[in-house]
Amino acid sequence: MNGVVNLVRMGYRKPPMDSTSSPRVVGTEVRRMFGAIAERYDLTNTVLSFGIHHLWKYRVARRVPQGAAPVLDLCTGTGDLLPLLEARADGVVGGDFCLPMLECGRVRGRSSAPLVQCDALNLPFADATFAAVTVAFGVRNLEDLRRGLAEIHRVMLPGGKLVILEFGQPTWAPFRAVYNWYSKVFMPWIGGCLTGNRAAYTYLPETAKSFPCGGDFEAILREVGFEATRCDGLSGGIAYIYEGCRPAAP
């Protein structure tokens, strides 16, 4: 994968090979699912969101401090957030556990950032490496949410910033009812037509519906050690941007 050699410069940590670091069947199935839809993943996201997810990701990039370096975009998928981050930061790296997603990103050539296949629960980076970490629509797919957030905390520099974009639930009841119908009926149908994998677009809305959002997720961020947390709802609560900082060194 182009640019992986740059990891040596930033610090490399070999994940421990113990019983807790081995991926379970559930994680393997999710990886295969994303691999199966990788080729048309970006197109499908644009159709299903009516293009608004591009605006959401632009807002994520704007939350990263200007000139921050280096920056990790975890669960990067095909890397569509990377060019936005490169416009603001130096030393951007994209990481994801799904190789077909990364290959799609590499072939499309959106970014010059190195792409790294990695497990979010055992990140292959040294402690205190990144000035900022972004995650767009990825944390809800982690097998162990708190462990994944703790790993992000570990690889961040003291004072570093975390920015997460994730789906939520609309706050206004009538809109929530329409959105839930759309997610349950329309998304699997369109997703199935575009990718040939209806099951994936049944699974993804279900994870969004069951994931803690708003203040509930913000509390989890504080629980694992982040401070100065905040959350902002987008498009009536369909998505949220979360922020947190690793405490600065005393």
Residue ranges of model-derived segments:
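A short SAM/SAH-binding and catalytic strip from SAM-dependent methyltransferases
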Residues: A131-L145
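A short acidic, Gly/Pro-enriched loop at the edge of an enzyme's catalytic core
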Residues: L121-A132
